[in-house]
């Protein structure tokens, strides 16, 4: 036997190469998580473009309110002024020059996402500017003023009564069904991403948000 010939280890090395495991695709984010990430990036861009420059550590509830007012230029919800003939009418019969604003429901949902994103990014609940009392008061004022201007009251949905409490064979009345259907509706802009794709530039215009 020729000692210079290929040994067992050489034969193994010359075999078929091992197949590397395919990398696992990244987990797809939910719609909420994707929206939250876009909103957070938009707010950070707003801070970078702020004049004078503003860091997240120095951001306060007043700056958050300033951001919400800035977003109004991208709004799609008609909010009638007190002197408008259509003030308080939910379905005005014609056009008017009143401004478009971000709907209260959109702003409320936006603040909820930004509040969560702030703490997920390392911020503490105590220093969270999106949870500031001033922000809550501002949102309440927006809700009340838009409810009066648009003639659409914002009421909390009442919990449905247990079906077990009703006598057997008795169905809910038509009025109750209609009320439940009405309670399920609301502002078309509620829960939308007010700042989803906004190019945040405090001093100028940007791309309109995906919903208002």
Curated annotation (Swiss-Prot):
Residues 31-158 form the ALOG domain. Residues 1-22, 167-182, 195-212 have a biased composition (Low complexity). The keyword DNA-binding applies. Its main location: nucleus. It is found in: Nucleus. GO terms for molecular function: DNA binding. InterPro entries: ALOG, ALOG_dom. GO terms for cellular component: nucleus. Keywords: Developmental protein, DNA-binding, Nucleus, Transcription, Transcription regulation. Residues 1-34, 148-212 are annotated as: Disordered. Disulfide bonds: none annotated. One of its GO terms (biological process) is post-embryonic plant morphogenesis. Belongs to the plant homeotic and developmental regulators ALOG protein family. Probable transcription regulator that acts as a developmental regulator by promoting cell growth in response to light. PANTHER family: PROTEIN G1-LIKE2, PROTEIN G1-LIKE7. This is Protein G1-like7. It comes from Oryza sativa subsp. japonica.
């Amino acid at each position: 036997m020729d000692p210079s010939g290929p040994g067992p280890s050489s034969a193994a090395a010359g075999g078929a190469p091992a197949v590397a495991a395919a990398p696992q695709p990244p987990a797809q984010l939910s719609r909420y998580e994707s929206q939250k990430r876009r909103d957070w990036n938009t707010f950070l861009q707003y801070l970078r473009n702020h004049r004078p420059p503003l860091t997240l550590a120095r951001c306060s509830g007043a700056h958050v309110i300033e951001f919400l007012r800035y977003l109004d230029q991208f709004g799609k919800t008609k909010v009638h002024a007190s002197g408008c003939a259509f003030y308080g009418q939910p379905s005005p019969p014609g056009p008017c020059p009143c401004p478009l604003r971000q709907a209260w429901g959109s702003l409320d949902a936006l603040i909820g996402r930004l509040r969560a994103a702030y703490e997920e990014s390392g911020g503490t609940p105590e220093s969270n500017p999106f949870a500031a009392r001033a922000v809550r008061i501002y949102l309440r004022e927006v809700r009340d003023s838009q409810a009066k201007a648009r003639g659409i009251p914002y009421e909390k949905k009442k919990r449905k009564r247990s079906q077990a409490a009703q006598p057997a064979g008795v169905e809910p009345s038509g009025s109750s069904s209609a009320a439940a259907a009405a309670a399920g509706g609301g502002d078309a802009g509620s829960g939308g991403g007010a700042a989803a794709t906004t190019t945040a530039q405090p001093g100028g215009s940007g791309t309109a948000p995906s919903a208002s």
